[in-house]
Amino acid sequence: MHIAIAGNIGSGKTTLTTMLAKRYGWKPRFESVDYNPYLEDYYKDIKRWSFPMEVFFLKERFKDLLEISRSDESVVQDRSIYEGVYVFTENNYAMGNLDDRDYETYMELFEDMTDAVQFPDLMIYLRASVSHLVSNIEKRGREYEQKMPLDYLENLNKRYEEFIKEKYKGRVLTICLLYTSDAADELTRV
């Protein structure tokens, strides 16, 4: 079984992934944010570093998806290849951070990759307000995230809604975290 956890930056994906893995004995797969050689530069100069950063994430997420698809273990995954493309890459393209050539190349690569794998059995989408996201981002203290513009998070939230409602074709469970200040407490109750 493959469960993917989707949600904006700071929504509680890692928290929920950890909780589900512990509770059900599933193997957790975490997004490797500490090992992306472009991520810190990306937050300093988004336009310059969008394409290499997005390609790096695509490569890593596809590698994870291949390993998951070849495994007999039940896996819970923190962020999927699908939201990476339909939320983050499309947002960068819409903001003018990717030109048409880079975007088209990226999308062709993504389509070729996803022809080789299946959708997760279930995607759990963590819907959260921007104030909730900012609170969690501040709490975890990653330096490169601290100067993230609020409109960037707002745009990502809009893209997530489009992704879940219009683009993703697999099964989805949505958990709303709009009015809570403690994601771990809220997710424990779920």
What is the role of each PLM region?
Residues 5:
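Hydrophobic anchor at the beta1->P-loop junction of P-loop NTPases
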Residues 8:
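P-loop (Walker A) phosphate-binding loop of NTP-binding proteins
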Residues 13:
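Conserved lysine of the Walker
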Residues 22-59:
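Conserved substrate/cofactor phosphate-moiety recognition/catalytic segment
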Residues 61-99:
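A basic- and aromatic-enriched beta-loop-alpha substructure that forms the phosphate/nucleotide-
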Residues 87-158:
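A glycine- and Lys/Arg-enriched "phosphate-lid" helix/loop adjacent to the NTP-binding pocket
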Residues 179-184:
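Conserved small/polar residues in nucleotide/adenosyl-binding loops
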